[in-house]
Design a protein with these regions (language model features):
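Conserved nucleotide-cofactor-binding alpha/beta core module
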Residues: 1-59
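Non-catalytic C-terminal accessory region of glycerolipid acyltransferases
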Residues: 6-7, 32-33, 45-186
Length: 186
């Protein structure tokens, strides 16, 4: 997912995995490529607020959003089932006016293939949460098409579909995120 409001350096968010040494290696690798990495949790400031600042300064944000890592993701229909995806990309587009442009990646032998989709515009109707939810539903549809075209390249090692989620674990994640069953997320 690319959210753009101009050109410049790239910022992303990384899930804070355990042990910390593994997270540090992921961050060091990405930073070695010139990517600014914000922690999804445990940072000195909100990743969402920093991303909004970067976008307003004309920089790029590249965000993975095909799974809910916080418990506060948005519910979408995905392959005919309810699923939860991170809503931050759409919420950032609504708040900052940055372009929301889904990207599909796949392998072609030893090389990458990529399709950068056209901007998903902010809907004229609804409040900011409704607008972001409608945009994330469009993202889900584009992801479905990309996964159908390249199913071998969707590397999902966690439950995505609501029916597959452990209710107790989901409730704990939602409680930790302070969201309940929110429509928001970042």
């Amino acid at each position: 997912m690319v959210i753009a409001k101009g050109a410049g350096s790239v910022t992303t968010v990384a899930e804070r995995v355990k042990p910390e040494s593994v997270y540090s290696r992921f961050v060091a690798f990405r930073e070695g490529l010139g990517v600014e990495v914000l922690p999804a949790s445990g940072g000195t400031s909100s990743a969402f607020a920093v991303l909004a600042q970067r976008l307003q300064a004309g920089k790029l944000a590249c965000l993975v959003c095909d799974r809910d890592v916080t418990g506060g993701g948005m519910e979408v229909e995905f392959f005919g089932e309810k699923a939860r995806m991170m809503g931050g990309p759409a919420a950032l587009a609504v708040q900052t006016g940055a372009a929301l442009m889904p990207v599909i990646l796949w392998f072609e032998g030893d090389h990458w293939g990529a399709h950068v989709h056209a901007e998903i515009p902010v809907p004229a109707e609804g409040d900011s949460k409704q607008q972001a939810a409608a945009m994330m539903q469009q993202v889900a549809r584009l992801f479905e098409a990309g996964i159908r075209a390249h199913p071998q390249d969707w590397h999902m090692l966690q439950c995505v579909f609501a029916a597959d989620l452990d209710p107790a674990r989901l409730a704990a994640a939602e409680s930790a995120a302070g969201t309940g069953r929110s429509e928001g997320g970042s």
